[in-house]
């Protein structure tokens, strides 16, 4: 994060790209693989595209592992833990779930025995999708102490991050949304 901040201080010729829990949307997670497939038809290798895709595909797994490790440090298992996922959309301040890493993260957490709720101001409910059948309703941002961990997956501008950190037992931040907030409760991944 600090390297990106330094690089974007350049007055021209820099486009910041921020790491997170995985890629989403209608083009970035899919289109490079089309290019790779097409290149193979002409006997070209696109190893860098494939490596980037591999890293991006594994980020939800990395994020879930960060949650499990953060809970373990608090002497709490992921199995049976109450988790609140903040943000469903694939990027901040939009209502688009296409290829969202949040859905994969929720599914992975549930498969490991976590009791998962979500909050997203753009999605009062989420149900059957192309790949996921979550059938969930947006949980209010009240009584955050009931959750063993709050996971920031989408950094919507509507969220009051200082308040979320203050009221939570543990926060895993996958988007650097808590930048500038100093608390032992925060785990940044």
Explain the meaning of each model-derived region.
Residues 1-189:
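Structural/interface elements that position substrates and couple domains in central-metabolism enzymes
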């Amino acid at each position: 994060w600090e390297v990106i901040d330094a690089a974007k201080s350049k007055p021209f010729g820099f486009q910041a790209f921020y790491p997170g829990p995985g890629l989403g949307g209608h083009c970035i997670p899919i289109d490079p693989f089309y290019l790779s497939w097409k290149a193979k038809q002409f006997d070209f290798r696109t190893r860098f595209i494939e490596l980037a895709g591999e890293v991006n595909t594994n980020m939800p797994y990395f994020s879930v592992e960060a949650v499990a490790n953060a809970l373990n440090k608090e002497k709490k298992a992921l199995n049976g833990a109450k988790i609140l996922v903040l943000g469903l959309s694939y990027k901040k301040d939009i209502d688009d779930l296409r290829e969202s890493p949040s859905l994969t993260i929720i599914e992975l957490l549930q498969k490991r025995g976590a009791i998962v709720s979500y909050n997203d101001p753009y999605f009062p409910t989420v149900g059957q999708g192309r790949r996921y059948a979550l059938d969930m309703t947006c949980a209010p941002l009240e009584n955050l102490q009931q959750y063993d961990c709050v996971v920031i997956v989408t950094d919507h501008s509507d969220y009051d991050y200082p308040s979320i950190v203050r009221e939570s037992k543990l926060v895993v931040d996958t988007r650097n949304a808590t930048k500038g907030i100093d608390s032992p409760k925060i785990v940044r991944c």
